Swiss-Prot record:
InterPro entries: SmpB, SsrA-bd_prot, SsrA-bd_prot_CS
Source organism of this protein record: Pseudarthrobacter chlorophenolicus (strain ATCC 700700 / DSM 12829 / CIP 107037 / JCM 12360 / KCTC 9906 / NCIMB 13794 / A6) (Arthrobacter chlorophenolicus)
Protein's name in the database: SsrA-binding protein
SUPFAM superfamilies according to UniProt: Small protein B (SmpB)
Record family assignment: Belongs to the SmpB family.
Statement: the UniProt record of this protein carries the keyword Ribonucleoprotein: no
Biased composition (Basic and acidic residues): 133-152
Record-level GO cellular component terms: cytosol
Gene name tied to this protein: smpB
Keywords for the protein's UniProt record, in alphabetical order: Cytoplasm, RNA-binding
Amino acid sequence: MPKESGRKVVATNRKARHDYHVLDTYEAGIALMGTEVKSLREGHASMVDGFCTFYNDELWMEAIHIPEYNQGSWTNHAARRRRKLLLHREELIKISRKVQEAGYTIVPLQLYFVDGRAKVEIGVARGKREYDKRQTLREQQDNREAQREMRERNRRRG
């Protein structure tokens, strides 16, 4: 069976970009069980409530839902277990220093496969205030209206 090439996205955390200002992003490997990998290959995962924390100088991803594999037996995994993230020591130190500052947190942004290996994109982020969220929504709506207007203008010309 040939190896997959490229990047196959399994799940994205769209809520994270809405609730946080993402400052830095990192790509991390994930320590997974076999049935978790098989479930991910089927495209099953949810990152909505996911977050990352440090335990014993290691970064762990929590509250990510990877459902049990359908054909799995007693070897199946727990759907919402804690999963270890694999990063270089220097990256871990840099992230932990940033998170120790007030208001910063680590959120998983995207779960994907690169050359057959499961990876997660994590972001060091600061929470948005309510008026920031409203302002972002307003800007997106204005951009949509401008795009719609440009399309209609181009259709009238053509």
